[in-house]
């Protein structure tokens, strides 16, 4: 069996629980040596054979996989981030299909999620942008004209741009030609979640100068759009008591007093906003699992709390009805003020339609 595994954006503890389990069980590991944190290789079992695919062609990779298949060995093909983004996995899967080799995919945390975490931002701010465009500049791999930077820039959505750090002068020109003003907020994030992570806030017009000043020439993502500033947004309807959802009925009125009454925060405990992944707990990262384990208090919807209780039965749990999200945020801050480390848990990634924005809003107020 071949497992195509996303290693996460860089930090060793951002591989998922499932990905780590598969890595530990593998007889053979083929990893993207130029991008995957080599520290993950310490998790392989004794006797595992490790190949660095940065020095291999597709044909050489497939020779290793085919031989392992014949010998009934478990293979992990370890890709950076999430394999579905710029991972070149389709050609590998096509080759395995022709050979009759079975495989599966273990998703990973993409570097664009790590980038949002590094910037402490939410990509999808109400009233500013509800869409994220993930793209790249044309290089040795061409980009269709309909998907050019200039075409996408006309949408004025949040843009996360991969594989383009060496072309920032041209990138700025294309962004402005597409409609972004020169002073549109932008950010450069170098090696998101790695120990050497670096974040630079700048503008569309000054991308190249900012990168040169900080000596950033590769391995960085570019974020463009008014969401980078993280201000001027509308209140989220998702957590507004006056808004009806499938899970709750609207309250008759909403005074806004919960937000305005939040006291000045001088927290002595730590507050973590933790994305639990897409579903089952083996989709959670080691970092997320550790953050929850390190906290005395866990706050969240009852359904999420029930998922983690079997693993953390001795924690203090804060669960409120679905009309009381802001109250739960306030209670979490109050626990921090009492010196208790607190985890606010939510599904998926906390920065994409998640709790991070509401926690930020309540905290600021």
Residue ranges and their predicted role:
Residues 9-10, 34-36, 52-59, 109-111, ...:
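Short, acidic/turn-prone active-site loops that include or flank metal/cofactor-
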């Amino acid at each position: 069996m071949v497992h195509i595994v996303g290693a996460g954006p860089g930090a060793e503890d951002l591989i998922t629980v499932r990905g780590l389990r598969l890595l530990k069980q593998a007889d053979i590991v083929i990893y993207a040596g130029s991008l995957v944190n080599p520290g993950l290789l310490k998790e392989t079992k004794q006797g595992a054979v490790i190949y660095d695919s940065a020095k291999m062609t597709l044909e050489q990779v497939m020779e290793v996989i085919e031989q392992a298949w014949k010998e009934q060995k478990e293979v992990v093909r370890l890709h950076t981030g999430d394999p579905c983004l710029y991972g070149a996995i389709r050609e590998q899967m096509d080759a395995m299909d022709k050979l009759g080799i079975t495989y599966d995919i273990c998703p990973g945390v993409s570097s664009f999620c790590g980038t949002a975490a590094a910037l402490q931002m939410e990509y999808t701010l109400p009233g500013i942008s509800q869409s994220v465009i993930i793209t790249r500049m044309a290089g040795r791999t061409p980009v269709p004209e309909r998907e050019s930077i200039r075409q996408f820039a006309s949408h004025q959505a949040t843009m996360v741009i991969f594989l383009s750090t060496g072309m920032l002068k041209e990138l700025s020109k294309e962004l402005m030609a597409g409609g972004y003003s020169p002073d549109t907020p932008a950010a450069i994030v170098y090696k998101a979640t790695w120990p050497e992570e670096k974040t630079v806030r700048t503008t569309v017009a000054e991308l190249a100068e900012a990168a040169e000043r900080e000596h950033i020439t590769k391995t960085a993502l570019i974020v463009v759009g008014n969401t980078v500033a993280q201000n001027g947004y509308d209140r989220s309807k998702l957590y507004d008591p006056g808004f009806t959802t499938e899970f709750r009925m609207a309250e008759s009125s909403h005074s806004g007093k919960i937000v305005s009454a939040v006291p000045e925060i001088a927290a002595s405990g730590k507050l973590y906003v933790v994305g639990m992944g897409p579903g089952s707990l083996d989709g959670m990262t080691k970092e997320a699992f550790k953050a929850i384990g390190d906290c005395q208090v866990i706050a969240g919807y009852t359904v999420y709390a029930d998922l983690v209780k079997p693993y953390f039965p001795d924690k203090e749990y804060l669960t409120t009805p679905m009309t009381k999200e802001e109250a739960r945020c306030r209670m979490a801050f109050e626990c921090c003020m009492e010196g208790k480390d607190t985890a606010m848990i939510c599904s998926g990634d906390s920065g994409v339609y998640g709790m991070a924005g509401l926690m930020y809003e309540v905290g600021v107020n």
